[in-house]
Amino acid sequence: MANVKLFDQTGKEVSSVELNDAVFGIEPNESVVFDVVISQRASLRQGTHAVKNRSAVSGGGRKPWRQKGTGRARQGSIRSPQWRGGGVVFGPTPRSYGYKLPQKVRRLALKSVYSAKVAEDKFVAVEGLSFAAPKTAEFAKVLSALSIDTKVLVLVEEGNEFAALSARNLPNVTVATAATASVLDIVNADKLLVTKEAISTIEEVLA
């Protein structure tokens, strides 16, 4: 099993944490990670695009001229698609772009990205992130003490609201709980900062 150093909030190494190889030590499956990232990005699309077809455009209820005898081409409505101001044919309508992948695929993708971060030495374990009150400056001190100055995803245990509130104004810092972190979140981060409790939760869910 892989061991990673465990730090406290001041950046001091206090011990080490043994990681479960079934979660943090597998061979990353890049193709599965790719599929899950595409799926999650598709789910983020707004999908509110819409145009009016000939039935939705205002006007055009009366035939513009009689069918025969004028010498002009027959027309039934001034809102037909060939008219200026007419309806759009086969235009986009509101829809959801999201689609779900099997749970086994999603779990394998999570294990793959966690394992990749550990292998690349981009996984920082911290004993805990406890704050007496939401303070952005205090959270910034923690990151500075741990020498984290890149885009970071902070994974905390459920109910640690002060950590999330303390980090929300910091650029390049995202906070999520261990149970809700997505593959897209992890891939987008340069480093992971994970509390000891969050590591236990991840192993419980994925092992």
Curated annotation (Swiss-Prot):
Listed SUPFAM superfamilies: Ribosomal protein L4
InterPro entries, sorted: Ribosomal_uL4, Ribosomal_uL4-like, Ribosomal_uL4_dom_sf
GO-annotated molecular function: rRNA binding; structural constituent of ribosome
Signal peptide start-end: none
Entry GO CC: ribonucleoprotein complex; ribosome
NCBIfam families: rplD_bact
Protein name, UniProt field: Large ribosomal subunit protein uL4
Organism, as annotated: Streptococcus pyogenes serotype M49 (strain NZ131)
Taxonomic lineage: Bacteria, Bacillati, Bacillota, Bacilli, Lactobacillales
